[in-house]
Regions:
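N-terminal "mature-domain start" segment
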Residues: 15-96
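Short Gly/Thr-rich strand-loop-strand
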Residues: 58-59, 133-179
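Short, well-ordered beta-strand elements
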Residues: 109-112, 185-198
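Surface-exposed amphipathic alpha-helical segments
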Residues: 195-220
Length: 220
């Protein structure tokens, strides 16, 4: 609920991940999850703003099927959905940062890392998500909660590689527009599920940039 719904409804440490590490990443143990996430200072710099506030870490999946039962779009619309991940994952950390820290925010970043039992299962999750996201491109979604319309959103074109999905979208609430980017990526047994939003008209690449930072911080 926190991420895409927050316009109308209601710190971690990080390894030195400025430069790309060499060689393939090792599988990630549960004990390493939190240090992979970016600090508030790093997020402020990346989002070219100040005053981003980090919310407490989340360790469980969400369920918003009551708002969007279409599973092709649910995982593209929201990070860390239980109906999308099922019971295949073994551990996760999610931290939401927004500025100003209120429902009517201007900048939002949701960063999450999810461990799967094996590299193969993590890659399989990305493949399944690619099939779903490809059926939710250039798509309008209008959602109502208790008779109250939530922000409308429209997705753009999907960019896909063998290890990453990138999907831009815009969200509108009255005359307020946000430009957003979703990124879903895999490295070893780790899935990175990221969302970044900035004021309308912005060029948003930060979700993909967070993926690069997290990958660079993984042990080799």
């Amino acid at each position: 609920m926190f991420s895409l719904i927050m316009l109308v409804l209601p710190a971690t440490s990080c390894a030195d991940n400025g430069d790309k590490a060499q060689g393939p990443p090792e599988e990630v143990p549960k004990s390493a999850l939190e240090r992979l996430l970016l600090t508030t200072g790093q997020v402020n710099a990346m989002m070219t703003t100040v005053g981003m506030v980090a919310h407490p870490p989340v360790t469980e999946m969400s369920d918003h099927r009551n708002l969007l039962p279409n599973l092709n779009c649910l995982g593209a619309w929201q990070v860390n959905e239980s109906a999308i991940y099922g019971d295949r994952w073994t551990a996760m950390r999610q931290v939401l940062l927004r500025g100003p820290d209120r429902d009517n925010w201007d900048n939002l970043l949701v960063q999450s890392v999810v461990i799967f039992p094996s590299t193969q299962e993590a890659a399989g999750f990305l493949d399944q998500s690619a099939d779903r996201w490809s059926n939710c491109t250039n798509h309008n979604v209008n959602i109502t909660l208790n008779g109250r319309p939530l922000p409308r959103w429209r997705s753009g074109d999907l960019t896909e590689t063998d290890s990453e999905l990138i999907l831009p979208f815009t969200r509108t609430d009255g005359d307020q527009t946000r430009a957003c980017q979703r990124a879903l990526a895999v490295a070893a047994n780790l899935v990175m599920d990221i969302q970044a939003c900035k004021p309308g008209g912005s060029s948003v690449t930060q979700a993909a940039e967070v993926v690069d930072k997290i990958k660079a911080a993984m042990a080799r």
